[in-house]
Curated annotation (Swiss-Prot):
Catalyzes the reduction of the glycolytic intermediate dihydroxyacetone phosphate (DHAP) to sn-glycerol 3-phosphate (G3P), the key precursor for phospholipid synthesis. It comes from Haemophilus ducreyi (strain 35000HP / ATCC 700724). Signal peptide: none annotated. HAMAP family: NAD_Glyc3P_dehydrog (MF_00394). Sn-glycerol 3-phosphate binds at K111, G140, T142, K196, D249, S259, R260, N261. The active site is at K196 (proton acceptor). Its EC number is 1.1.1.94. GO terms for cellular component: cytosol. This is Glycerol-3-phosphate dehydrogenase [NAD(P)+].
């Protein structure tokens, strides 16, 4: 496959994170075409040259082009970056499949597992698209607003295709603001990005109940152990979970209120229902979906994940927060 770094990158998904990645790419000199599923929103973004809904007051670089038609977007590009919620991932793959040529290469920054099954997005992509296109996943500790503002950020890009990974690292990496680390462990990078959302809900619940820094740190530490156990059972490299896509993303999401998942947990810990909390946040809370999928995956793998299990019980089985805490604290004593 020949490559052409002068061809635009197509970013599919015009929410806050997709827009932020498109801004970062364009700022780095890459011609970038951003498409979203809502044509009216895309017209507004094209006219105003910013995403006033998600990232107000951050103007688009000249190299960022807004697209309304998916087919036209893909005709321009060789490299495709998918940035949609996990529950919409399969749908966007079905939409692009008939539009793909042999030249297209596919990367995603979606963090999650397949809705209602708990399957890795890589598995979903292979099933729908096939194996004729190179795949990569982009994940790590990145809040959309900080990325869009050009504040220093580091992230992990994982792929089994070394040429694709190296070329995308060159296209994304900006020495002044955006550092990209390469990895070959797609399983570990995907799991870290998905399950940290669930642990962040737990950290938010703990803080919402006023349990303090000690409890939050314990949740983060034991949460990382749960992620690592599940990852190893699926063939992930344990070292991945100590990197940007593991520990880095977990700490960021659990400790900063820019995280929707943490804010969702805070609201739950303060006695609000899941419906009330989601309505207040007003955006997709990936961890709400990820909790069920992670629980299903852990059950299939026969891996003990007590934090994930208790958050699942709270969200989907009406268990109250106090009983969740009691269940975790009263578990059988064990070695670390």
């Amino acid at each position: 496959m020949t490559t052409d770094d002068t061809r635009p990158i197509a970013v599919l998904g015009a929410g806050s994170y997709g827009t932020a990645l498109a801004i970062a790419l364009a700022r780095n000199g890459q011609r970038t075409h951003l498409w979203g599923h809502n044509p009216d929103k895309m017209v507004k973004m094209a006219e105003q040259r910013m995403n006033t809904e998600s990232l107000p007051a951050i103007p688009f670089p000249n190299a960022l082009i807004i697209e309304k038609v998916l087919a036209h977007t893909l005709q321009q590009a060789q490299d495709i970056l998918i940035v949609v919620p996990s529950h919409a991932f399969a749908d966007i793959l079905h939409q692009i499949k008939p539009l793909l040529t042999t030249q297209h290469r596919i990367m995603w920054a979606t963090k999650g597992l397949e809705h209602n099954t708990g399957r890795l997005l890589q598995t979903v992509a292979t099933e729908i698209i096939g194996e004729q296109h190179p795949f990569a996943v982009l994940s790590g500790p990145t809040f959309a607003k900080e990325l869009a503002l050009g504040l220093p950020t580091a992230i992990t890009l994982a792929s089994h295709d070394a040429k694709f990974a190296d070329e995308m690292q060159q296209r994304i990496h900006c020495s002044k603001a955006f550092r990209v680390y390469l990895n070959t462990d797609m399983i570990g990078v995907q799991l870290g990005g998905a399950i940290k959302n669930v642990i962040a809900i737990g950290a938010g619940i703990s803080d919402g109940m006023g349990f303090g820094a000690n409890a939050r740190t314990a949740l983060i530490t034991r949460g990382l152990a749960e992620i690592s156990r599940l990852g190893e059972s699926l063939g992930a490299n344990p070292k991945t979970f100590m990197g940007m896509a593991g520990l880095g993303d977990l700490v960021l999401t659990c400790t900063d209120n820019q995280s929707r998942n943490r804010r969702f947990g805070l609201a739950l810990g303060q006695g609000k229902s899941a419906e009330q909390a989601i309505a207040e946040i007003g955006q997709v809370v990936e961890g709400f979906y990820n909790t069920k999928e992670t629980y299903l995956l852990a059950q299939r793998q026969n891996i003990e994940m007590p934090i994930v299990e208790q958050i699942y019980q709270m969200l989907f089985c009406n268990k109250n927060a106090n009983d969740v805490v009691t269940s975790l604290l009263e578990r059988q004593r064990k070695k670390e």
